[in-house]
Design a protein with these regions (language model features):
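Acidic/polar-rich alpha-helix caps and helix-coil junctions
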Residues: 1-101, 125-301
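Eukaryotic alpha-helical solenoid repeat scaffolds
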Residues: 107, 111-112, 167-170
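Charged, low-cysteine interdomain linkers and short loop/connector segments
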Residues: 111, 118-119
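Short Lys/Arg-rich basic patches
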Residues: 120-124
């Protein structure tokens, strides 16, 4: 049903109807959704097909966020202002919603502590260079780190009101995700050269003082870094590592946890570690009560 709706709806989209396309479900947004959908279905050739519609001339670099150039010199307020703008080529679909996410993701419960920031953002990577995120990592309090991405805008109930609602503008689909989806699909199609090409395009915008002569990724470099003789296993790990760092604190990691049945492990400040196993039914959201009243069975718990 989802696939049928996707394909039929895609043919009906007319981008000319929108003065600000990125606030609407355009063809590019539909193609991005298709890459995510077919990745879950393991129809990898279709992932590559739809991703390539977004990069028709393989012009990946010009459509990725310029983290190691333009973004590098921005203040955190400027980053917050730019990350979710409709003029940012990397944003394919932006949606506003009432949320306190922007004020909470730098806090204790949702924060990135020193151990995790070292593991995800600061540890060595296959290029041999330093991720640019090191230089845009800010502290939100003791042992809480964040990268300025999605900012809050507060809408008052009236001009003179002291109360209102917090909103955020969320990038639901981005060119970075599309690129990673294509790279992952090419791993399983055993198109390792294509995987490496995408990762090199990405790395050229994410490595501090990037130099092709020093930081170019090769299949041999991947095997050596991940200590494997299996090109596919190494390439998949490289894709996952870059993707994890790219979307830190955005929630995109959840899709990978689902596809690869990875347990969720959360150390707590008090000491105990909380684990959500790969087969735990709590990993599936509960059916809303309204739907239950309509006769839809709830998910097991």
């Amino acid at each position: 049903m989802i696939e049928k709706d996707l394909l039929e709806g895609m043919a009906l989209i007319d981008d000319k109807q929108y003065s600000v396309p990125r606030y609407h479900f355009t063809k590019a947004a539909a193609y991005a959704f298709a890459t995510r959908f077919y990745l879950f279905k393991r129809q990898y050739a279709k992932v590559v097909e739809y991703a390539s519609k977004i990069f028709p001339n393989n012009n990946i670099v010009s459509l990725l966020r310029p983290w190691n150039s333009e973004y590098r010199i921005l203040t955190y307020n400027e980053l917050w202002s730019r990350y979710a703008k409709a003029t940012e080529p990397a944003n394919l679909l932006l949606v506003e919603t009432v949320s306190t996410w922007a004020r909470n993701y730098i806090g204790v419960r949702y924060g990135l502590d020193a151990q995790k920031s070292n593991e995800i953002l600061l540890a060595p990577n296959v290029t041999g260079g330093t991720r640019i995120f090191r230089y845009q990592l800010y502290t939100g309090g003791t042992n809480n780190y964040f990268i300025p991405k999605v900012n809050e805008y507060f809408v008052r109930e009236s001009i003179n009101a002291e109360i209102g609602l917090p909103y955020v503008m969320v990038p639901l689909f981005t060119t970075e995700e599309v690129m990673f989806n294509r790279a992952e699909a090419n791993v399983f199609l055993n198109n390792i050269n294509d995987v490496v090409n995408d990762l090199n395009a990405y790395a050229s915008t994410r490595i501090y003082n990037y130099s092709a002569s020093t930081h170019t990724i090769t299949a041999g470099k991947i095997r050596s870094f991940y200590r494997t003789s299996d090109n596919q296993a190494g390439a998949l790990q490289a894709v996952m590592d870059f993707k994890r760092a790219e979307f830190v604190q955005e929630g995109m990691r959840w899709f990978d946890l689902l596809r690869y049945k990875i347990p969720v492990v959360h150390p707590t400040y008090e000491g105990p570690t909380l684990t959500l196993k790969a087969d735990d039914p709590m990993r599936v959201f509960q059916i809303p009560d309204v739907a239950k009243l309509a006769g839809i069975a709830q998910n097991p718990r």
